[in-house]
């Protein structure tokens, strides 16, 4: 039975804007209050999905969430008609309006942590929705994310859905952005690598400038929920010093595929025992770990963050080599591009690079890896997935036409209070649920 890594990319929402909501994400802060183009953002994402599908990779689409999140505003004490609520919140709390209008669910690497059937004791694929409780604008995503995943992976024989962990600091969970899987074929047992920023109970090393969003306790809880064998799980601490330089998730400083771990020299807390444990566990599944460590002398942490070199997709090719999917910013950084040029000619596993323009997402701090949720599936499981979300030439055309019909080509903060934007969004999402055969996944569809 064949195995695949299926990438489910988030479709950028209609309220995509630059509000600087994500403290610790330097691109988000740098582009605060600049003009956004939601239509272009959505099309840039769709082009990447289509290009990878055309190369033969399994590619799915995850829909955006309803924004502004009117239910959240009502929960926070705003009342009256939708028009009255928007008018009041823009006057009394403009930052709150921006937060409940964020299109951040596009970064589906934070949607959930996923464990394949080959790794779980019950032989099923497990999903735990991330609580994202470090940032309010992201913490409000969990319920709709859960509804979306349950609609797409809707077969209890193959898929298990867990609620988000308790939304408290001790169990801060950022999903797959702090999770890697190392092994061989995708349908064979592998080692799951959970990367955390701090320990809630024991304390220890922590960043001082920016928050460590993922806790060890959260990672351990997810491993338990997913029924993982402790001998096939490793918990690694991210280097607090790089968090303080803008590495707010591990996928900004490392990426893996099969038996290859591509990471910066300073990505993790130096601990030879952890790497020895990882190599030992890899040996038990008859796999040899291949690490590609990028020296700080060639690419600094600052250059890695500004270029998003590691916020890339590492994909297996038919010839046994690997393709690295990078944002245009990596090509534009001389040190990074020089390193990559050497890398693909070094005889190692990575022999090709593909560059994508994702600038609208990148200005908010989200590159190729942020935009996708990896789900390893076998043939039977893939057949059980809602096929309407899988990228095809016909779906690409349908979604592009949908974007052209519904998305604005410029958006400023003042537009978020426009009741017409809310109605445009609801009409668009209602139509999208029909295109993707998702059912009623949005709150407004239950009014």
Swiss-Prot record:
Keywords in alphabetical order: Arginine metabolism, Hydrolase
Assigned EC number: 3.5.3.23
Disulfide-bond pairs as recorded: none
Pfam families registered for this protein in UniProt: AstB
Catalytic machinery residues: 174, 249, 370
Gene Ontology annotations of biological process type: arginine catabolic process to glutamate; arginine catabolic process to succinate
Family classification: Belongs to the succinylarginine dihydrolase family.
HAMAP family: AstB
Protein name per UniProt: N-succinylarginine dihydrolase
Source organism of the structure: Yersinia enterocolitica serotype O:8 / biotype 1B (strain NCTC 13174 / 8081)
Encoding gene per record: astB
């Amino acid at each position: 039975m064949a195995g695949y890594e299926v990438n489910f990319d988030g479709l950028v929402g209609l309220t995509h804007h630059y509000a600087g909501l994500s403290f610790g994400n330097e691109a988000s802060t740098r582009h605060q209050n600049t003009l956004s183009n939601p239509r272009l953002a959505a099309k840039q994402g769709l082009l990447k999905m289509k290009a990878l599908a055309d190369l033969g990779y399994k590619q799915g689409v995850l829909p955006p969430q309803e924004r502004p999140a009117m239910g959240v505003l009502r929960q926070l004490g705003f009342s009256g008609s939708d028009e009255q609520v928007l008018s009041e919140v823009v006057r009394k709390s403009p930052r709150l309006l921006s937060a409940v209008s964020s299109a951040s669910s596009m970064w589906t690497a934070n949607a959930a942590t996923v464990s394949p059937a080959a790794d779980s004791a019950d032989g099923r694929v497990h999903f735990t929705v991330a609580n994202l409780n470090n940032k309010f604008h992201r913490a409000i995503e969990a319920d709709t994310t859960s509804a979306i995943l349950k609609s797409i992976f809707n077969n209890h024989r193959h898929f298990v859905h867990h609620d988000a962990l308790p939304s408290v600091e001790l169990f801060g969970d950022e999903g797959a952005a702090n999770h890697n899987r190392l092994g061989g074929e995708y349908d064979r047992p592998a080692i799951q690598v959970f990367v955390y920023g701090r320990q809630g109970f024991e304390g220890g090393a922590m960043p001082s400038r920016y928050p460590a969003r993922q806790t060890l306790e959260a990672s351990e809880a997810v491993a338990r929920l997913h029924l993982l064998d402790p001998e096939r799980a490793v918990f690694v601490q991210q280097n607090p010093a790089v968090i303080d330089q803008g590495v707010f998730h591990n996928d900004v400083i490392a990426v893996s595929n099969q038996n290859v771990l591509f990471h910066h020299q300073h990505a993790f807390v130096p601990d030879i025992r952890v790497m020895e444990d990882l190599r030992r566990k890899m040996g038990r599944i008859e796999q040899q770990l291949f690490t590609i460590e990028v020296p700080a002398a060639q690419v600094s942490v600052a250059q890695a963050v500004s270029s998003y070199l590691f916020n890339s997709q590492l994909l297996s090719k038919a010839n046994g080599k690997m393709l690295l999917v990078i944002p245009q910013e990596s090509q534009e950084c001389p040190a990074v591009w020089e390193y990559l040029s050497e890398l693909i000619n070094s005889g190692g596993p990575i022999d090709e690079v593909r560059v994508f323009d994702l600038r609208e997402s990148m200005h908010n701090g989200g590159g190729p890896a942020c935009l996708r949720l990896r789900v390893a599936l076998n043939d039977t499981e893939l057949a059980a997935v809602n096929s309407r979300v899988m990228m095809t030439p016909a779906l690409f055309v349908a979604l592009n036409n949908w974007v052209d019909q519904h998305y604005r080509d410029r958006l400023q903060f003042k537009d978020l209070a426009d009741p017409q934007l809310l109605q445009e969004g609801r009409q668009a999402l209602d139509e999208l649920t029909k295109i993707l055969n998702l059912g009623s996944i949005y709150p407004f569809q239950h009014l």
